[in-house]
Structure formats: structure tokens, C-alpha cells
Regions:
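Short linker/helix segments within small regulatory modules
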Residues: 14, 157-168
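Short acidic beta-strand-loop surface patches of small beta-rich interaction domains
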Residues: 2-17
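BRCT (BRCA1 C-terminal) domain core and associated BRCT-interaction motifs
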Residues: 76-90, 97-100
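Short, Lys/Arg- and Gly-enriched loop/turn segments at beta-strand edges
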Residues: 29-41
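Short functional micro-motifs and their immediate structural scaffolds
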Residues: 144-148, 180
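Short cysteine-rich clusters marking metal-coordination/redox-active sites
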Residues: 139-142, 172-175
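Loop/turn positions that initiate beta-strands
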Residues: 18-25
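Residues immediately within or flanking Cys/His clusters that coordinate Zn2+
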Residues: 136, 169
Length: 196
């Protein structure tokens, strides 16, 4: 329970009920920001982390490009997905309704769209993630965090054209891949802006 409304007003557990009070009780909200009301939990707004099933590989890449912690491995079966989701407090995104019926699973969402771009917009809307997009935060390949790195430290890994043209670089903490803000970055930025 994260929210109790009595007669339309937010109250805490200590509220004493009166005759005729109308009560509504709500779980943790995923798709709207309820920052300015009386929360019953110490940290109601969450760090949104996902784990995706085998059907959502392209959605995984879009979510990582937007900076969201997104776990995906097409070799995982349903039981492994549920185990990881529960251990790491991840939301399962799936096209498999059967997976969502698992009694051990506490947080999941059935992705309705079939087009990867539309799926991405669906997830942004469903979990109210517009304001949380952070480009150049996660590696689209392995989900590792990207950290700024000085060009001098990676000179030997860059092609001459890249060395001359770009000055801002990032390295993945997971797979050591190097990224820079080239034309692909502008395309990603434009793509993300389409969903606002």
C-alpha cells in the first residue's frame, strides 16, 4: 500500500476513520507521479529496472539507449526471468501472458504493441518515463553504465577520422566498448524526441 485517500484527501495510516468516510487504497504507482501527496512508504518513487523476455530484443535496445537499466538474455527461460526479476526488483516486460501468471512474480507488464518503436512508446507512457530518459547512460549492447573518458586514454583504439572529428567519448563499464556523440547520437536523440 502506497496511498490511502479518505474523502479524496491523502492520509497516513494514523488517520482515525469517521462515520461516512469514503476510503480508497492504492499500491505503488508506476504510471503517474504522486510526489506531492502523503506516502505510506519511505521511498514511493522507484528506480525503474526491467527484464525482458525473448520476444523483446529490439525493445531492450531502445530502453538501454534511453538510459534504462534493462536486462535481456534470449537464453533465459521463464523461471530464470522470474527469479532475476524478484531478486533484483525488476519489472518483467513480456509478450507471453503465461509468464505473467507465475505466482512468484510480483511486477510485470504485458506489452501489447508488436512494432518495436510503438512498444517503446507504450512503455514510456505506461510507466511515465518521459522525464527519466538519459542518453549516453547505458551501453545498448550489454547494459553497462557509460562513463566519460578522456580521448588521450583511448587514442590507440580510435580511427584517425574519429580522433580528429569528435572530442566527447564514453566507455562501457561492462564490455569496454567506446562510444562518442557522432551522427548516430543525434539520430538517437531525434528518435527519443518523437515520443515526447
Amino acid at each position: 500500500v502506497d496511498l490511502i485517500l479518505v474523502n479524496g484527501n491523502s492520509v497516513s495510516f494514523s488517520y482515525q476513520l469517521r462515520q461516512g468516510d469514503r476510503i480508497s487504497v492504492y499500491p505503488v504507482f508506476e504510471s503517474m507521479d504522486i510526489t506531492n501527496i502523503c506516502h505510506l512508504r519511505p521511498a514511493p518513487l522507484r528506480e525503474t529496472k526491467f527484464i525482458l523476455d525473448v520476444h523483446l530484443g529490439k525493445l531492450c535496445k531502445f530502453l538501454r539507449l534511453a538510459g534504462f537499466d534493462t536486462w535481456y538474455d534470449k537464453s533465459y527461460d521463464d523461471s530464470e526471468i522470474v527469479r532475476i526479476a524478484e531478486e533484483q526488483k525488476r519489472i518483467v516486460l513480456t509478450r507471453d501472458k503465461g509468464l505473467l501468471k507465475n505466482k512468484k512474480l510480483s511486477r510485470g507488464y504485458w506489452v501489447r504493441a508488436t512494432n518495436p518503436k510503438i512498444r517503446f512508446g507504450e512503455i514510456l507512457k505506461r510507466f511515465d518515463l518521459w522525464e527519466n530518459i538519459q542518453l549516453a547512460k547505458r551501453c545498448p549492447t550489454c547494459n553497462g553504465l557509460l562513463t566519460p573518458i578522456a580521448q588521450e586514454e583511448i587514442e590507440d583504439k580510435l580511427l584517425p577520422f574519429i580522433r580528429k572529428t569528435y572530442k566527447e567519448f564514453f566507455q562501457c563499464s561492462g564490455c569496454d566498448k567506446i562510444y562518442w556523440k557522432g551522427p548516430h547520437f543525434q539520430m538517437i536523440k531525434k528518435f527519443m524526441e518523437e515520443f515526447k
